[in-house]
Amino acid sequence: MADVLDRVVGQPDAVAQLRAAVDAPVHAYLLVGPPGAGARGAATAFAAALLCPDGGCGQCRDCRLVLGGEHPDVVVLTPEGAFLRREDAGEIIRLATRSPVEGARKVLVLADMHRVQDDGPMLLKTIEEPPPSTVFVVLADTVPEELVTIASR
């Protein structure tokens, strides 16, 4: 059966790991790759699989909403400007502590986290120990020092 993760092209090892994680996800995932490598698409497909009652069928309401960028329990956050601002970090922490709107979990996709700097430690505790209903998918071009702790887990 085809599923949403079949849409991720050229990353069979990453897809296999994400597919294996759908039934029992952990608190955070770090997807690293250069621009154009497909990390954002993989994160979206993974979010759909996590919220889908069938593990990512691609056809149900949850899958369609996630893939269309309209699911209330999936939030994609991209820092504005050259670096992650304190306000951005605060918003991420606030969103992480809110309950899901529709389902049992919510997914926060944190894009361009290679741009995190001084406020990285502020986010670290939230990313490492979110509420049980929150799954983080962290996207980065590289793994800067501030993300090493996340990468090591």
Write out the residue ranges for each language-model feature.
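P-loop/Walker A NTP-binding region and its immediately flanking N-terminal helices
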Residues: M1-D118, V135, V148
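Short regulatory helix/loop adjacent to the ATP-binding pocket of P-loop NTPases
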Residues: D118, M122-I127, P144-R153
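Active-site catalytic pocket residues across diverse enzymes, especially alpha/beta-hydrolases
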Residues: L50, I127-P130
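Sensor-1/coupling segment of RecA-like P-loop NTPase cores
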Residues: P130-L147
